[in-house]
A protein has these predicted regions:
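Acidic, low-complexity intrinsically disordered tails
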Residues: 1, 640-688
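P-loop NTPase Walker
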Residues: 1-112, 183, 206-207, 261, ...
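ATP-hydrolysis module of ASCE/P-loop NTPase motor domains
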Residues: 17, 80-83, 101-190, 213, ...
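Helicase P-loop NTPase motor core
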Residues: 29-35, 100, 271-274, 279-372, ...
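Conserved phosphoryl-transfer catalytic core
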Residues: 59, 75-76, 82, 235-257, ...
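Conserved coupling/interface region of RecA-like P-loop/ASCE motor cores
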Residues: 62, 106, 123-126, 140, ...
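Conserved helicase/translocase P-loop NTPase motor core
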Residues: 88-91, 167-215, 225-231, 557, ...
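Conserved helicase C-terminal RecA-like lobe
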Residues: 162, 345, 359-371, 384, ...
Length: 688
């Protein structure tokens, strides 16, 4: 196999096949090429020729495993089919299918789904006289999962120290595990925990697996948890031909149980290991890498490395300060429009943010400008259930004959108007030739409708009519708050959410709707009305069905977490403020702040050529304008790599070219249709 196209560190990583090896693969350094070349090299060059079945390559997603296997077959031919490429969990499941009976489970076991797990957790809580209405079973399950990912068996789980949930978890975990076993089930985390127990407790199995897998490769090693590390050490046996490929600077999944110390302390787990550093970047311009290097260098707990590239020059990074989040979104949309006109394809542009809730203003501005986009790693803001419910209330208040919206919210929150009642009213509407709303107004006269149901329908009609009058008086956001309070929308949303975290996210989405209304009212002034707001949000069906210019290319919107492993010519990293980046929930412990810095590094290194880091000077939080402090990470950027653009500063002189171009283009927003230079077709948005 020709290794001449590999750089020296890459070649060293490929040909170092014996003994433990840590490959520190920086962002864009070609790690996938190194892994595939290394496997093929082992197949070709080892004395006597290694068999494909002696190689185990572990990835973190099934998609990555499939893609790697395809590359191997393309490079080495059919013999590469014998290489086992899979996730840790898939490997564990295969082990258990053969030998789980040795642990007392039936040979044909089931993997419990979330519903099964929660039912068993609640039963175990009741066994210990724990009120499953007072304590969230999902949180207990999360803590048990965390214990399993740390490699802790039930008898080893730490006892709670003053925290009720820790104590409950300590009590419930053993009962939960026994209940799983009694019904012949395992959970997802057991796919790591139980195989390790098999290898520890059964010497013949240990010998079987260590004899078969002579070469182990683990991709994305920085994302491993302790349960995976324990399994890997057992599989490595005495031969210890372990190649771990990863980047501690991209360790951003501690909330999933990933343990960055696995990569930082690799040599303590595998003494005498060698280390190869891949520092040449094939993705980004040097100016982008200079910024990334400067940010990540401030982390004390890391493997020292400095990314470099042959791609010198390039435009400086734009650090943009905007008056507020709406103007930040408008700036992003304008710059996207400008760069697309200069030839950058929409699918080579990404907007990154720390939390999903930040997408709303950007989505609105992209819709307004007719720029097609897709939201990755979560539903689009206006597709979220709680948001659609609020918007449906607006639609019914603005137009009671909107039957789809009416059916959506007539019993949301629950008010005793069930499906049977609505089916009967629908039948009467068809028979009388009137709208469903009109039929609801006649509910007292329908004999097949119980008096109680008719009364509930009447109360709902009165609610809608009353709020129609209130909305016509203006103050849209204020009236919406009053409506949501009266119907108990927040309480119902919180009660129906699967977890406390999910409830918080849903309520934040509701707050974003209110912020959107307030921004709309400020912008439109006396012209603001519920109907004009809805018209702005709505997409014309005909335009949705039209082909977006350039085929189906779309700008990508996603969290920084979701962007890992991806790359774009143009990247906008928005919300570069304290409490967002770094996130307010991660600023307490030093290790949390270090992870936020790594997250910032990941976001920066997604950019190949152009990078914008933007922030808002003011954000609306719970109906109030709050000043925002610039992210501390902006202070770490090298001055020579940065061009600052301040759109929020008071005007004291002539505007910069950047500002002049930005504000000059705002007039496009106010052009009447048909005046030329419009925004183009409305996007056909979709969820990925």
């Amino acid at each position: 196999m020709d290794l001449s196209k590999l750089n020296p560190p890459q070649r060293e990583a490929v040909i170092t096949t014996e003994g433990p090896l840590l490959v520190l693969a920086g962002a864009g350094s070609g790690k996938t090429r190194v892994i595939t070349h290394r496997i093929v090299h082992i197949l070709n060059e080892r004395p006597g020729g290694a068999l494909a079945r002696n190689i185990l390559a572990v990835t973190f997603t099934n998609k990555a495993a499939t893609e790697m296997k395809e590359r191997l077959v393309k490079m080495a031919g059919p013999r590469a089919q014998g290489v086992l490429v899979c996730t840790f969990h898939a490997f564990g499941a295969e082990m258990l299918r053969e030998d789980i009976h040795r642990l007392g489970w039936p040979r044909k076991f089931a993997i419990a789904d979330m519903g099964d797990q929660l039912a068993l957790i609640r039963r175990a809580m009741r066994d210990h006289k724990v009120d499953d209405r007072a304590f969230d079973a999902r949180k207990v399950l999360t803590l048990i999962s965390k214990a399993k990912n740390s490699g802790l068996e039930p008898q080893l789980s730490p006892e709670g120290m003053g925290d009720d949930y820790d104590l409950i978890t300590h009590l419930v975990y053993p009962n939960y595990q026994l209940a799983l076993k009694a019904q012949g089930s395992v959970d997802f985390d057991d796919l790591l925990l139980l195989p390790a127990r098999l290898l520890r407790e059964h010497e013949d199995l240990n010998e079987k697996y260590t004899r078969r897998f002579r070469y182990l490769l683990v991709d994305e090693f920085q994302d491993t948890n302790m349960a995976q590390m324990n399994l890997l050490r057992l599989l490595a046996g005495k031969v210890r031909n372990v190649c771990a490929v990863g980047d501690d600077d991209q360790a951003i999944y501690s909330w999933r149980g990933a343990e960055v110390r696995n990569i930082l302390e690799f040599d303590s787990h595998f003494p005498g290991s060698r280390e190869v550093r891949l520092e040449q970047n094939y993705r980004s311009m040097q100016v982008v890498l200079d910024a990334a290097n400067a940010v990540i260098a401030k982390n004390p707990e890391r493997k020292a490395k400095r990314m470099w590239t042959d791609r010198l020059g390039g435009e400086r990074i734009k650090v943009v300060t905007c008056p507020n989040e709406e103007e930040e979104a408008r700036f992003v949309a304008h710059e996207i429009q400008k760069q697309m006109a200069l030839g950058i394809s929409a699918d080579d542009i990404a907007v990154l943010y720390r939390t999903n809730g930040q997408s709303r203003p950007v989505e609105e501005m992209l819709r307004e400008k007719g720029i097609a986009y897709e939201v990755v790693g979560g539903s689009e803001f206006f597709d979220r259930r709680e948001v659609k419910d609020v918007i449906a209330y607006f639609k019914v208040i603005a137009n009671p004959r909107d039957e789809v919206s009416l059916l959506r919210i007539v019993n949301v929150p629950a008010r005793g108007i069930g499906d049977v009642t609505m089916e009967r009213l629908h039948a009467h509407a068809r028979a009388d030739g009137v709208s469903l709303w009109a039929a609801m107004g006649r509910s007292q006269g329908y004999e097949d409708l119980p008096a109680g149901a008719a009364e509930k329908v009447g109360e709902f009609l009165q609610l809608i009519e009353r709020y129609r009058g209130l909305f016509e008086e203006g103050k849209l956001a204020q009236v919406t708050r009053q409506l949501l309070e009266e119907i108990g929308f927040r309480e119902a949303t919180r009660a129906l959410a699967p977890s406390l975290t999910a409830a918080d996210k849903k309520l934040k989405s509701v707050d974003h709707v209110l912020n959107s209304l307030e921004s709309f009212e400020k912008r439109e002034g006396p012209k603001a009305s519920l109907l004009t707001y809805l018209n702005r949000l709505s997409l014309d069906t005909r335009q949705e069905e039209e082909e977006v210019p350039g085929g189906h290319r779309r700008v990508t919107l996603m969290t920084v977490h979701a962007s890992k492993g991806l790359e774009y010519r143009l990247v906008f990293f928005i919300g570069m403020e304290e409490e967002l980046m770094p996130h307010k929930g991660m600023q307490g412990e030093p290790q949390n702040l270090e992870e936020e810095r790594r997250l910032c590094y990941v976001g920066i290194t997604r950019a190949k050529e152009l990078l914008y880091l933007s922030r808002a000077a003011i954000r609306v939080k719970r109906g109030k304008e709050v000043p925002c402090t610039p992210s501390r990470f902006l202070e770490d950027l090298p001055p020579e790599a940065v061009e600052k653009v301040d759109l929020a500063a008071p005007r004291t002189g002539a505007p910069t070219d950047q500002e002049r171009n930005f504000f000059a283009n705002l007039k496009d927003r106010f052009k009447p249709k048909g005046a030329g230079g419009g925004a183009g077709p409305t996007p056909a948005d979709r969820k990925v």
